[in-house]
């Protein structure tokens, strides 16, 4: 039987559009079982390590996620994701001044793929992606072109699902390199 694990940091206020809600509905419609990982990104490294060490339910979901055959993940704009995570404005300014344009898995990347900053994160990180069978990045809109390219350069992506506007801008950026 198919099994889906859902890792969502619960960003934003619209529950219907959060990844955990979408993935739950998808799993139900596909007849798959699913497990959710509820660990906020905003916890300290000490608390996160304690949760991962002591909570067998969380650890088992993290272990399943790290053994995934197929991973579908989103790519966000660094500025938008930093605000969603309620990072302090002065820190967001520094993050952007340091060149962050894209975000995936709580890791902020520059256009050249350098990792600028990483939040405390239960689950996968960009460096875990080479161990996954097929990695599918999903993002769209002209405003996300730089973010998409930064994450592609920072980590392995086997498939990109995007729209025409973002694709054209990515091609333009690559031609100007």
Spans of model-derived segments:
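Short, small-residue-biased leader/transition segments that mark boundaries at the very start
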Residues: 1-6
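Conserved phosphate- and dinucleotide-binding cores of soluble alpha/beta proteins
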Residues: 10-177
């Amino acid at each position: 039987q198919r099994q889906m694990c859902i890792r969502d940091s619960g960003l934003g206020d619209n529950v219907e559009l959060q990844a955990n809600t979408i993935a739950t509905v998808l799993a139900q419609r596909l007849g798959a079982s699913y497990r959710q990982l509820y660990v906020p990104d905003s916890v300290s490294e000490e608390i996160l390590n304690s949760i991962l060490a002591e909570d067998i339910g969380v650890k088992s979901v993290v272990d399943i996620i790290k053994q995934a055959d197929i991973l579908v993940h989103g790519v966000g704009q660094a500025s938008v994701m930093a605000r969603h995570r309620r990072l302090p404005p002065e820190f967001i300014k520094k993050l952007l001044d340091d060149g962050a344009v894209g975000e995936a898995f709580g890791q902020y990347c520059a256009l050249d793929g350098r990792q600028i900053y990483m939040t405390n994160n239960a689950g996968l990180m960009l460096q875990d992606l080479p161990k996954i069978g097929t990695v599918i990045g999903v993002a769209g809109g002209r405003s996300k072109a730089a973010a998409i390219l930064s994450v592609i350069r920072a980590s392995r992506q086997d498939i990109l699902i995007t729209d025409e506007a973002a694709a054209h801008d990515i091609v333009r950026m690559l031609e100007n390199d």
